[in-house]
Regions:
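Active-site-proximal helix-loop-helix substrate-binding element of RNase H-like nuclease domains
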Residues: 5-22, 63-92, 96-179, 183-186, ...
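Short, glycine/acidic-rich hinge or "gate" loops at secondary-structure transitions
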Residues: 191-198
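Sterically constrained small-residue positions within well-ordered secondary structures
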Residues: 36, 53-55, 114
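N-terminal accessory regions of nucleic-acid-interacting proteins
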Residues: 1-43, 47
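Short, flexible, glycine/charge-rich loop motifs used to bind or transfer phosphoryl groups or to couple energy/partner
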Residues: 32-34, 52, 87-89
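An N-terminal structural lobe/cap that precedes and organizes the functional/catalytic core
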Residues: 48-67
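A common structural microfeature
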Residues: 40-44, 59-61, 70-71
Length: 222
């Protein structure tokens, strides 16, 4: 894995395209879907919850990025209450691979909304298969890109509205580099002869999103 960075990592402070606002209106949602449909390549995605503050496992924020569309932050609660059709999102991204980190935490919430990835690339699963000693997103990003991500809002109450700018920045950064990571990790999986094994793991995770609902997973080493 030739992209290992031994120098001091630099802190990624903001997404290259700036800090996006939260989309909470149907009109804004339509614009996001149109942009995603016009974009290309894999879809980087993530979700934030408020499990320590509210009962249940609802997603209170969905982050996504696709080449040509930039980063979008969606308020799934407000959009659902306004009558958003999540099939519009599914159709916009089509057969694109969804890049998630620790997909077992995010797929159940996506399934609850009706979001249906057709293909998956999980950077945490890939990191484990590649033998990385630390496989949290911050550690994987540092390993491959020499970049570190701030994690100070990981346990925040994501049901809070309006979301402060630094929270939105944190959320956007979680998907900022996933596309780059997918490209590099796919290369290393092929080189290690583990690409087919990885696809089997991704397919299994994608086919069993509800099975892990409510299970307690140990935190990924950062």
């Amino acid at each position: 894995m030739s992209d290992v960075h031994d120098t001091e990592p630099r802190l990624l402070k903001e997404p290259r395209g700036g800090v996006p606002d939260v989309t909470s209106t149907i009109e804004g949602y339509h614009h996001v879907c149109e942009a995603l449909a016009d974009a290309s390549g894999s879809l980087a995605a993530d979700a934030e919850r408020a499990s320590g503050f509210r009962y249940g496992h609802e997603d209170w924020l969905i982050q996504c990025k696709r080449e040509g569309a930039g980063i979008a932050l969606l308020d799934p609660i407000a959009l659902t209450q306004s009558g958003a059709d999540w099939n519009e999102f599914n159709e916009a991204v089509g057969d694109a691979t969804w890049i998630l980190h620790d997909s077992l935490m995010d797929l159940p919430g996506f399934a609850d909304l009706g979001l249906q990835p057709k293909a998956l690339f999980d950077t945490e699963i890939a990191a484990r298969l590649l033998g990385l000693h630390r496989f949290g997103l911050a550690a994987v990003t540092e390993h491959y890109l020499g970049i570190t991500l701030a994690k100070e809002h990981s346990a925040a109450d994501w049901s809070y509205r309006p979301l402060p700018r630094d929270w939105r920045n944190y959320a956007a950064l979680d998907v900022e580099v996933l596309i780059e990571l997918e490209n590099l990790m796919r290369r290393d999986l092929r080189a290690a002869g583990k690409d087919e094994w990885a696809e089997e793991e991704f397919t299994h995770a994608l086919a069993n999103p509800i099975r892990f609902r409510g299970c307690a997973f140990p935190a990924s080493p950062s």
